[in-house]
């Protein structure tokens, strides 16, 4: 391998200015993501605010309905992945590997692990809104369409998809919404001491 053959390196073997700039930009972005991780409510409020701004923009411009429809389908897809277990119980039920321990399903504890974790769901949904917002600045994405048909398609698709997901949840007895491990409180310490 000769000098300068690796990606991002200049002729002299040092990383190029552009490569260093984008590397640093990626590090700053990742740092902000890492800092925002514990603030779930704040993250979702910001995302809802961006969504509201996007809807106002589409309403005022009276266009970009195809972009909005695509954003809705994308968010529906993310939501279904968020509600789905990482390992599909129907695939586990059909396996012919023979018996495994424990033999009764009701005795086995299986924690619910999502196919799409909450943070990745939020991150993807926010990026989707920002991309859709960027698309509204380009007239090429403003395809003329009769928007009530798109609304009806979306409502129909949402109802069919959620009905199937709820049936799956009932059949395999899992609830995707839990609040974590229960916390048990002991008796309160009133501060009194006993003299012996």
UniProtKB/Swiss-Prot annotation:
Q: Which InterPro entries match?
A: Rer1
Taxonomic superkingdom: Eukaryota
The Gene Ontology biological process annotation of the record reads:
protein retention in ER lumen; retrograde vesicle-mediated transport, Golgi to endoplasmic reticulum
The membrane topology noted for this protein in its Swiss-Prot or TrEMBL record is: Multi-pass membrane protein
Span-the-membrane segments of this chain are 41-61, 63-83, 140-160
Which Pfam families does its entry note? Rer1 (PF03248)
Question: What is the annotated localization of this protein?
Answer: Golgi apparatus membrane
Q: Which family does it belong to?
A: Belongs to the RER1 family.
| Protein known as | Protein RER1
Provenance organism: Gallus gallus (Chicken)
Lineage of origin: Eukaryota, Metazoa, Chordata, Craniata, Vertebrata
